[in-house]
Amino acid sequence: MTTSYLERVISFDSIRISKPTILENGIRGDITITSGGSAKTFRLIYTYSEPVAVDERIAGLILTMPVINFTYFVRELRLDFPVGAADLDLIRHFLKVNAREVFVNKICRRRYEFIRKEYIPAESDINSSNSDGMTEVIAPLSAQGSYEVRGDKKNSAVLSSGGKESLLSYGMLKEIGERTFSFFFNESGGHWITAKTSYDYFSRNFRDVIKVWSNVDRFYKFMQRQVKILDQFAVTRWADTYPLQLFIFPVYIFALIPFLIKHSISSVFIGDEFDDPREMPEFHGLKHYYGIFDQSLDFNRLMSEYFRSIGIDSVLTSAVYPISGNVVEKILLQRYPELFSLQRSCHSCHYENGKIVPCGRCSKCLGIQMFIKAAGGNPTAIGYESISTEELHRRVLSERMRLDSDELSFMKSKLFDNNEPEVSHVTGMHILPGEKNPGELMPDYVRDKIVEILSKYTSGNFSLINGEWVLSEQ
């Protein structure tokens, strides 16, 4: 009998997450992987910037989130801590979604050759049986009751990273009078360098800066060494993405839960800017999220429903989901120049002459430089080298850009052809399918004030009609 593709890529018989150890300002637990009778263990650590109260249920779930990045390759996920029915439903859903995202976007639609050639699927292997994984969750269903945590509508938190979306979200929330907690997650890897400029400035100048330190990036490297389909030489080369990990924001959000409870935070703002729903066709009949499930509105809804189901009165939302990246950059640069100066939108930031600067050449950096120039700014203000528009054009043409096609075409036309379209949805505010007005997915107690700010920098409201974005009548 022929072995299925899914069977061939399995690397672990089980992954076990231990009962967590809870400290005054942190948690830790052991992640044990077994394969063929041998076992290896990694101790995962989270340290909070202030004392927090957390029980075994939440602590165990916090430890579980990084592991889900690798569960496509395991038969059993064993949880040695109490969970409730809502927790188990969420984990099973996460496992299925992440399995398909890894299969489609890291193995089939890969941007880098991290996968050993013998494990690249044949055309006949690309089906739902192989994409949805086989992982069974084994856990004690013993957690009872809910947390009865009331959120204060004046208290919001922003997942802060040094990127334009989180900086703009912070600026708008502060301006409209919210008590805004900036939450930083130091995963002890290169991504912290990206956030450090903002973190250092916020710590010196603003109140309510909260942080978690974790060794999760070291855990990722530990796990990558155990996954047999990975080319261990290829994963050491430079890339602007992880070899397998696509389940990043749940790690941050679950780590934030003890702070949500302690500070009665009612809204968590994540930097989901506009993604054109027309740009997401199925892959061989497989519906997927193009590797950004955890930055989708579906994910926000799912987490908000989960919080409600366990008695935490908080929602996960976005203040920038109606607008494209170029508009985010424009508002940040023109309305909040102090925050703009902190922006480091690059996963390969490094030190030069004592300052943290972006690489300037990855697809993310090239997009940011286009946005800044289009908004009338100077990219050198946030650490980019001084290059001509012609050189930027050459670099853009040679790179696989990761922008929605309409936005990329608009930017090229405006910057490189001096031919800006008169009307384009990429400079407007989007009314998504199911909405009657822009911003309806934001909490009602901040919506109108945020939409008012956005409207000052956009070219009107656009609705999707018969597959085209059409300017609404004013």
Q: Which positions does each model-derived feature cover?
A:
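Low-complexity, highly charged intrinsically disordered N-terminal segments
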Residues: 50-144
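Nucleotide-activated chemistry modules centered on ATP-dependent adenylation/adenylyltransferase
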Residues: 1-30, 109-156, 166-474
